[in-house]
UniProtKB/Swiss-Prot annotation:
Function: Binds specifically to cytosolic chaperonin (c-CPN) and transfers target proteins to it. Binds to nascent polypeptide chain and promotes folding in an environment in which there are many competing pathways for nonnative proteins. Required for tubulin stability and spindle and centrosome formation in cooperation with Vhl.
Protein name: Prefoldin subunit 3
Disulfide feature: none
Subunit structure: Heterohexamer of two PFD-alpha type and four PFD-beta type subunits. Interacts with itself. Interacts with Vhl and betaTub56D/tubulin beta-1 chain. Interacts with tubulin alpha-beta heterodimers by itself or in complex with Vhl. Does not interact with microtubules (MTs).
Matching Gene3D superfamilies: 1.10.287.370
GO biological process assignments: centrosome cycle; establishment or maintenance of neuroblast polarity; meiotic spindle assembly; microtubule-based process; mitotic spindle assembly; protein folding; tubulin complex assembly
Source lineage: Eukaryota, Metazoa, Ecdysozoa, Arthropoda, Hexapoda
SUPFAM superfamilies in alphabetical order: Prefoldin
One MF annotation (Gene Ontology) recorded for this entry: tubulin binding
Pfam family, one: Prefoldin
Length: 194
């Protein structure tokens, strides 16, 4: 699989986008005092709640991307094995004895005659018969597409990790800002005579 992974280029990103999935970018809060002085950010708890909600959305996206990555990682070897089988069938010019799974732990021996066609599962309970050349072309196309999709997903995962980290840092900075403000308010009330 590494040979195929190296030979397939990552698809081009859409113009003015940093991700394939359209993941929104988290803005790093450079000037926390300026940010917190804006009218919509007057309450530290509400800002933390908004950031926590954004963090939760990023985590949800990360779970979805990981599930997609796992599916693609398992799909690529299956496609490669199917392609290998098409190549084996192409080379065969006489009957070949093989075993296939009849049920759990039960195999049966059979003779496979030379063939010029193969049946491929296309998904959604659809199976079609293809000549060996067309089957090979389709499988190569599917492998290339799956590898490209895998690279896109891995790129988005890297980007998403950065957004999660940025959001976590922002949450920590806002929380610390709130602690300092409460400490300053406590000091002010403690030093002012009643």
């Amino acid at each position: 699989m590494t040979g195929i992974m190296d030979s397939v280029e990552m698809p081009k990103l859409p113009e003015n986008q940093k991700t394939f999935a359209g993941i929104p970018e988290a803005v790093f809060l450079e000037e926390i005092d300026t940010f917190m002085s804006q009218p919509e950010n007057e309450n530290c708890e509400k800002v933390l709640q908004r950031l926590d909600e954004q963090h939760g959305k990023y985590r949800f996206m990360a779970c979805n991307l990981e599930a997609r990555r796992r599916k693609l990682k398992s799909q690529i070897p299956d496609l490669e094995r199917s392609l290998e089988m098409v190549n084996v069938l192409r080379k065969e010019d006489e009957e070949r004895e093989t075993q296939f799974l009849l049920s759990d732990q039960v195999f049966i021996k059979t003779l496979v005659p030379p063939t010029k066609t193969v049946y491929l599962w296309l998904g959604a309970s659809v199976m079609l018969e293809y000549p060996l050349d067309e089957a090979e072309a389709l499988l190569n196309q599917n492998i290339t597409s799956a590898v490209g999709n895998l690279k896109s997903v891995e790129h988005d995962q890297d980007f998403l990790r950065d957004q999660i980290t940025t959001t976590e840092v922002n949450m920590a900075r806002v929380y610390n800002w709130g602690v300092k403000k409460r400490q300053a308010a406590t000091k002010t009330t403690a030093t002012t005579p009643s």
